[in-house]
Regions:
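Short active-site neighborhood of thiol/selenol oxidoreductases, capturing the structured segment around
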Residues: 266-292, 296, 310
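Structural micro-motif
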Residues: 337-341, 357-371
Length: 412
C-alpha cells in the first residue's frame, strides 16, 4: 500500500483494542532513560539519549542533543510496540518491544521518501553517547574545515567546539547553515560527534594526523563524505549577505503563491504596503529553518504592531503533492503557534525549481534564505542560510545585529 498510515489513524485503530492493550504495554516498558542507536552502516552507529516519561495516561519523550532537549508529545505505547512521531518533521520511530530492556525497529523519514528508513535499537540504559578515554589533543576553539575536498561537492566550513575533559560540544558552520547541536567525545587521538533531531541524523568520526584531523561525515544512511580540519582562530566563511542577490535588470521582488487555505497572496497586496517585510524562504522539513522560525516568531510578536510583516515561502519535500505540502506546513504552524502567513511556493524543494519560482534572484543557495524589504519596497538585505542557537555566541551576535537592523528599518 503506497500511502503510509498516519500515527493519528494508527492511534484510533489501537484504541479500539481496548484496555487490555494499555495494561500489557505498561508491564512491558517502563518510564526512564533510554539509549537509541541508528545503524547508519554495517560499522557506524549513531547513538543518542532519550527520556521516556508518563504523565497520567499520556506518554511523552525527550531527545537530548547537548544543550538541546526536544520534547515529543506524540508517543504511542501498545502491547508489543512503541511509536514515536517527531514534532514538526514528517518522521517517526516504529519499534517492537523485545523485552523490558530492548526494542528494535526503524526510524522513518518520509520527507526523504516513503521507503526511507534507518534500522534502530533502543536500550534501557543511561550512558554517555560514546566510549571515552584520556584525550590526546585539545579540540576547544575554532577550526578551518573542508568537506568533500577536491571533489565536485567540496565546500568550506568552520568548526566551533568546547571541550571539558573528554566531552565535546559544538557545531560546524557552513555557508548554508550550521549542523546544529553536536555532542561527542575525544577518545585518545579520535573524535566522535553526533546529532539527531528528527530530520538530521549526523555522525562525524575522525582522528588527528599531525596538526590535521581527518575523518568522515555520515548523514543518515544516504550520504557520507570525507572532511579535514585544522585549528585556526581566524577561520571564517564568506558573508551570508553576499551570496544571494537580485539579477541585473531587476529592482524588486515579486511573487504570488497560495496560502494554506489555497488563497493567493502577493507581495503587492495592500497589507504589505508601507510595511517592513521579511520574506523567509524555507521548508517545514528543514531543521535550520525551524531554528530560524522560532526566532522569527519572537520578532513578529515584538515588532508586528510597529509595522513588521513576515511571509514564509515554503518549498516542501512532498513529491509534488500539494495537499501533503499544506498538511506538513500546517503541522509546523500549529506546533509553534505561528501567526504570520505561510505560502506554498512549491511542493518540491529542488533548488533549481525554487529559483525558477523567484527568477529575479541569482539562485536559491540555501534553505533558509531571508530577504529584508523596507517600507518603500526596496530590498535592503538578503541573508543566505542560518546559524542557529547551536553556534552559541555567533547566534547571539547575529540576533543582536538583525534586531537592530529591523528597528532601523521600522524607524525610517
Amino acid at each position: 500500500m503506497k500511502k503510509i498510515i498516519s500515527l493519528t489513524i494508527l492511534s484510533l485503530m489501537l484504541a479500539c483494542a481496548g484496555e487490555k492493550t494499555t495494561s500489557m504495554a505498561q508491564t512491558e516498558l517502563a518510564a526512564g532513560e533510554y539509549r537509541l542507536e541508528l545503524q547508519l552502516t554495517s560499522e557506524q552507529t549513531l547513538p543518542f539519549e532519550l527520556s521516556l516519561q508518563k504523565d497520567a495516561d499520556q506518554w511523552r519523550a525527550i531527545i537530548h542533543n547537548a544543550a538541546e532537549n526536544i520534547e515529543v508529545d506524540e508517543v504511542l505505547l501498545t502491547a508489543d510496540s512503541l511509536f514515536i512521531r517527531m514534532p514538526v518533521f514528517d518522521s517517526e520511530f516504529r519499534l517492537a518491544i523485545e523485552s523490558e530492556q530492548q526494542l528494535s525497529g526503524a526510524f522513518y523519514n518520509y520527507s526523504r521518501g516513503l521507503d526511507y528508513q534507518i534500522p534502530a535499537k533502543m536500550f534501557a540504559a543511561a550512558q554517555a553517547r560514546f566510549t571515552t578515554a584520556q584525550p590526546n589533543f585539545e579540540i576547544d576553539g575554532n577550526w578551518e574545515a573542508v568537506f568533500s575536498d577536491e571533489l565536485e561537492d567540496e565546500y568550506p566550513a568552520v568548526g566551533v567546539f568546547k571541550q571539558e575533559a573528554d566531552y565535546v560540544s559544538g557545531t560546524f558552520l557552513t555557508e548554508t547553515g550550521d549542523y546544529r547541536f553536536l555532542e561527542g567525545a575525544v577518545n585518545g587521538d579520535k573524535l566522535q560527534l553526533a546529532c539527531f533531531d528528527g530530520a538530521h541524523a549526523f555522525l562525524f568520526e575522525g582522528a588527528m594526523e599531525g596538526d590535521t584531523l581527518r575523518g568522515t561525515f555520515w548523514s543518515g544512511n544516504h550520504w557520507q563524505e570525507p572532511f579535514w580540519m585544522v585549528k585556526n582562530p581566524e577561520a571564517s566563511l564568506r558573508s551570508p549577505e553576499e551570496l544571494t542577490y537580485l539579477k541585473e535588470g531587476y529592482d524588486k521582488l515579486s511573487f504570488s503563491f497560495p496560502d494554506l487555505a489555497g488563497k493567493p497572496v502577493s507581495l503587492s497586496d495592500q497589507g504589505f504596503q508601507d510595511k517592513v517585510v521579511l520574506i523567509q524562504i524555507m521548508g517545514s522539513w528543514c531543521p535550520n529553518c525551524l531554528d530560524e522560525t522560532q526566532l522569527y516568531k519572537q520578532w513578529y510578536e515584538r515588532y508586528h504592531e510597529q509595522g513588521l510583516e513576515i511571509v514564509a515561502l515554503a518549498f516542501e519535500r512532498s513529491r509534488g503533492d500539494l495537499g501533503l505540502a499544506q498538511r506538513n506546513v500546517q503541522r509546523l504552524v500549529d506546533k509553534l503557534e505561528l501567526a504570520y502567513p505561510f505560502l506554498i511556493a512549491n511542493a518540491d524543494n529542488d533548488k533549481a525549481a525554487a529559483a525558477a519560482k523567484l527568477p529575479m534572484l541569482n539562485a536559491i543557495l540555501s534553505y533558509p534564505t531571508s530577504i529584508y524589504i523596507d517600507r518603500k519596497g526596496e530590498i535592503r538585505r538578503i541573508h543566505t542560510g542560518f546559524n542557529g542557537p547551536g553556534t552559541g555566541d555567533i547566534y547571539l551576535r547575529y540576533r543582536e545585529d538583525y534586531e537592530g537592523f529591523i528597528e532601523k528599518l521600522l524607524a525610517e
